[in-house]
A protein has these predicted regions:
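Extracellular, repeat-based ectodomains that mediate carbohydrate processing or recognition
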Residues: 1-186
Length: 186
């Protein structure tokens, strides 16, 4: 093992809670590596969120030298002072595409309900064109347990050319349910 290297500094949400709700939003950085033979082979990627002082922002950092140095954070979604992004996940395809998923409240003017979003970078994590995965809204307080816990279980992976995502969803109005969706890449 090498000596630890500082990747980046993040701020957690006030009281570790999602604003406008009582839901906890712990920060679980997710790391991936480009194992392709492409232009960004060997690049390490980490997705996380940080508190900007006004909202939670999902960001990706990357290292092209085995983790010795790290890039400045790149926002995955368009910056805004009005909506939160949280519970990100990341994976790298066999061809070097960087896939990120997260929950996003950009389409709720009250910044409460969320939808699932994804972004796939084909330029080594420099840009992340966004794709909205769900049309219906989920309310983070609709969890059935009454204890301000919606689950923090999001994830994604690649199956050949397909990017597969899983997230918590309460758009049916009852307890949280895991939902799986796929984005076919052509």
């Amino acid at each position: 093992w090498s000596l630890p290297h500082l990747m980046t500094t993040v701020k957690h949400a006030p009281n570790w809670e999602l604003p406008n709700t009582g839901q906890r939003v712990y920060n679980y950085p997710v790391i991936g590596v480009d194992n392709s033979n492409g232009a960004y082979a060997g690049t390490l990627y980490v997705v996380l969120y940080t508190w900007t002082g006004a909202y939670l922002q999902v960001q990706v950092i990357r290292s092209a030298d085995g983790g010795t140095t790290w890039s400045k954070p790149v926002p995955v979604a368009p910056p805004s002072d009005t909506h939160d992004q949280f519970f990100p996940s990341l994976s790298v395809s066999p061809t070097g595409k960087v896939g990120v998923t997260w929950l996003d409240r950009r389409n709720d003017p009250n910044n409460i309900d969320y939808q699932a979003f994804a972004a796939i970078s084909t330029d080594g994590g420099q840009t992340f064109p966004n794709t909205q995965l769900t049309q219906a809204f989920s309310n983070p307080d609709t969890n059935g347990t009454g204890d301000n816990w919606m689950g923090d279980y999001t994830g994604n992976t690649w199956a050949g050319p397909d990017f597969i995502a899983a997230w918590m969803d309460s758009s049916n109005g009852v307890d949280m349910q895991d939902v799986v969706g796929g984005i076919r890449l052509h």
